[in-house]
Amino acid sequence: MSEIGERVKKIVVEHLGVEPEKVVDSASFIDDLGADSLDTVELVMAFEEEFGCEIPDDAAETILTVGDATKFLEKNAKS
């Protein structure tokens, strides 16, 4: 897993309180990790803060899995 992927995983574990081994690229925030819509908004905000970038609403709606978040942030992260 890339450095960005590891940082994404850490944020997901902290925010959702899930076991680290469950946080894999294919894991859906809602279906596999038990997030609700508020959790997903909070995750997006945490990603924005951690990586110093803005995630527009239309992009946020396409980030459904850990892998989706990692791919988006690898392209758009500032730090």
Curated annotation (Swiss-Prot):
SUPFAM superfamilies named among the record's database cross-references: ACP-like (SSF47336)
Pathway of action: Lipid metabolism; fatty acid biosynthesis
Highest classification ranks of the organism: Bacteria, Pseudomonadati, Pseudomonadota, Alphaproteobacteria, Hyphomicrobiales
InterPro entries: ACP, ACP-like_sf, PKS_PP-bd, PP-bd_ACP, Ppantetheine_attach_site
Main location: cytoplasm
Membrane-spanning segments: none
Pfam families named among the record's database cross-references: PP-binding
Biological processes per GO annotation: lipid A biosynthetic process
Protein name: Acyl carrier protein
Residues with PTM O-(pantetheine 4'-phosphoryl)serine: S37
Organism: Nitrobacter winogradskyi (strain ATCC 25391 / DSM 10237 / CIP 104748 / NCIMB 11846 / Nb-255)
Family: Belongs to the acyl carrier protein (ACP) family.
Annotated keywords: Cytoplasm, Fatty acid biosynthesis, Fatty acid metabolism, Lipid biosynthesis, Lipid metabolism, Phosphopantetheine, Phosphoprotein
UniProt-annotated location(s): Cytoplasm
